[in-house]
């Protein structure tokens, strides 16, 4: 299917309805093979994050909480997790797991993690509805389009007001994706989006403490987005029309934006899922270009971490809340420029092991983390969010200065993560839960663009 909102924006149609119509049309005119392949890559990445996340104490605690609330087993599985649950519980718990280790994908221009809300919601529903893989992939494409279209309009206005765009826009994307899978028409999908918008929320207050609440934002969005789609199908309530751009709608409430005609979404040459990134490193995406710069410096110059007197990072304003974060917990360390920069310099890589409690007590990394400074520059600001730049300068004890500029981090649409690298990332994550033979089979199966039953993932 061609990405053409001009055809969807019929006379008198609102931008919200045009998005809903576009989602509904995916069932009749499926995306191109290239777009489906990209959807499969994001699904592979997301399910790998989900499997790894299921082993985290925070996720296990969330599972125990849900078990205590509802002791009766449900019909729907958890990918990589125990027992069976209601469809809403499954969606919410898988979304928390997807985001637990900062491995999940994102979209820079919207500053959003779309897959962590969309994929778990559609997977849980797909299991319940006995859907096939191609229908699932199409619904994921639809959910990305809605979530990113909202988020890229809200960003940076919403974050400046203290809102995180992932739960604000992600809940509406999850609703659109689930409504698409359920076979609702444009009016029904718009109703689901309208219902979901009342569940939008999520604050950036965690940057000042309580960082693990961030992990629950996608869980809320996935669960309530799915609930909204089910409500729309059953006719339980009618969602407000034009909920994105309308008076007191999403854009006005969260971004102070009073006018939106959807033109930015219409003008995109590629669907949102093809413009979203996959992470090579399990940490905040704002830090990735600086990691790439350190890796480039290691590749072209002979130096050791012990030679470094100071690490100077230049970045853009949206990244600055991470400039001086501590690293006392795994969740906050993954968002901390000082810790990640020091880790990259000392170990020459950034992996999950570098955020463990044992790693966070290492004297060598702690000493270098104290020597990291981060500054906002006009040069970086002028390029963001169209690109995500950073410059890293290492000041060596010898007096020498080594500097590297990265215009866009690895994993972006312009610098895509290779299939081989994605498969390695997925294999490492799946390997925490599944035996080697199952890992190989999973990766191969998720790359098959065929209508095989989603039940095979149970």
PLM features: what roles do these ranges have?
Residues 116-123, 170-177, 223-227, 289:
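Well-ordered alpha-helical segments within folded domains of soluble proteins
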Residues 128-140, 183-190, 238-241, 302:
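Structural helix-adjacent loops and short alpha-helical linkers that scaffold large soluble proteins
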Residues 1-112, 208, 213-223, 230-458:
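Terminal-appendage/accessory-domain detector
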Residues 146-172, 218:
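Aromatic-lined, polymer-binding surfaces characteristic
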Residues 97-152:
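Hydrophobic alpha-helical hairpins/lids featuring a short glycine-rich hinge
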Residues 121, 169, 178-185, 190, ...:
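Short glycine/serine-rich loop segments
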Residues 53, 122-129, 175-181, 228-232, ...:
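Well-ordered alpha-helical scaffold segments within catalytic/enzyme domains
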Residues 195-203:
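Flexible glycine/proline-rich, aromatic-decorated loop/lid segments
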């Amino acid at each position: 299917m061609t990405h053409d909102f001009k055809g969807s924006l019929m006379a008198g149609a609102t931008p919200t309805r045009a998005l809903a119509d576009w989602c509904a049309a995916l069932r009749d005119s499926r995306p191109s093979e290239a777009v489906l392949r990209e959807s499969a890559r994001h699904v592979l990445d997301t399910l790998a994050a989900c499997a790894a996340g299921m082993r985290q104490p925070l996720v296990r605690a969330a599972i125990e909480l849900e078990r205590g609330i509802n002791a009766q087993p449900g019909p729907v599985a958890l990918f990589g997790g125990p027992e069976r649950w209601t469809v809403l519980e499954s969606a919410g718990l898988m979304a928390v797991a997807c985001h637990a280790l900062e491995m999940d994908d994102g979209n820079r221009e919207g500053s959003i993690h779309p897959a962590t809300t969309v994929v778990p919601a559609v997977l849980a529903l797909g299991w319940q509805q006995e859907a096939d893989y191609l229908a699932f992939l199409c619904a994921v494409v639809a959910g990305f389009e809605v979530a990113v279209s909202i988020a890229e309009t809200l960003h940076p206005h919403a974050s400046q007001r203290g809102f995180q765009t992932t739960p604000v826009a992600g809940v509406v994307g999850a609703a659109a994706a689930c409504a698409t899978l359920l076979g609702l028409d444009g009016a029904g999908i718009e109703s689901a989006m309208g219902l979901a918008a009342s569940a939008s929320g999520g604050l950036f207050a965690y940057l000042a403490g309580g960082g693990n609440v961030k992990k629950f934002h996608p869980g809320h969005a996935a669960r309530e987005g799915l609930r909204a789609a089910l409500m729309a199908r059953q006719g339980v309530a009618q969602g407000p029309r034009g909920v994105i751009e309308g008076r007191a709608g999403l854009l006005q409430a969260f971004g102070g934006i009073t006018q939106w005609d959807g033109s930015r979404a219409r003008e995109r040459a590629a669907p949102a899922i093809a413009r979203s990134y996959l992470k090579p490193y399990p940490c905040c995406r704002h830090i990735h270009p600086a990691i790439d710069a350190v890796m480039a410096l290691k590749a072209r110059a002979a130096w050791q971490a012990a030679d470094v007197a100071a690490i100077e990072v230049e970045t853009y304003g949206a990244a600055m809340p991470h400039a001086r974060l501590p690293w006392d917990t795994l969740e906050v360390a993954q968002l901390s420029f000082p810790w990640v920069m020091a880790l990259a310099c000392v170990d020459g890589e950034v992996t999950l092991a570098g955020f463990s409690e044992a790693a966070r007590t290492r004297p060598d990394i702690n000493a270098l983390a104290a020597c990291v400074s981060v500054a906002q520059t006009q040069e970086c600001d002028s390029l963001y969010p169209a690109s995500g730049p950073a410059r890293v300068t290492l000041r060596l004890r010898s007096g020498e200065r080594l500097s590297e500029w990265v215009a866009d981090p690895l994993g972006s649409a312009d610098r895509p993560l290779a299939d081989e690298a994605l498969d390695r990332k997925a294999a490492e994550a799946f390997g925490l839960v599944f035996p080697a033979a199952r890992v190989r089979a999973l990766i191969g199966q998720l790359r098959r663009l065929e209508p095989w039953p989603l039940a095979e993932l149970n």
